Amino acid sequence: MSEKKQSISAIREIFAAASETELPALYLEYEEDSRAGVQNLIQKYQKQEEALKKERERTEQMKIYEHKYEDLGWICGIDEVGRGPLAGPVVAGAVILPRDSKILYLNDSKQLTAKKRDELYDVIMREAVAVGIGYASPARIDEINILQATYEAMREAISKLSVKPDVLLN
């Protein structure tokens, strides 16, 4: 009597519920299943694991700067998130994270998807030591030019931090 195979949707649910440490065992368990859907599922999760590994490596490289300056005090990251009079105002954010923060995918906001920006917003607002937002209107951009308006928005964001930064990283 042959054993009935699990449905691909059931296997998909198993993978979705698995922790990162459980995935290698699942790959082994299902590697002999020749169905294309199962093999595609394994490949999908392996690609996600590889992407996560690369992101952790990228984040560790970024921490080189943090460790280089950590003895100086609070380190603040600054990012301009909106640009140009045609597209609206210039908005800048300034964030001080706890030392050795483990937040992944921190990057130039324009390189992130809208979904990832929303996810990171929640994490940053929950974990940050301090957050400041600065703004320059399209009229202000026309008045002083885009570059100066960007600097002005960044200065405003820094001034709104509840903790004074000692080092600024742009």
Give names to the regions the model predicted:
Residues M1-C76, E80, L86-N170:
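Acidic (Asp/Glu) carboxylate-rich active-site/surface patches
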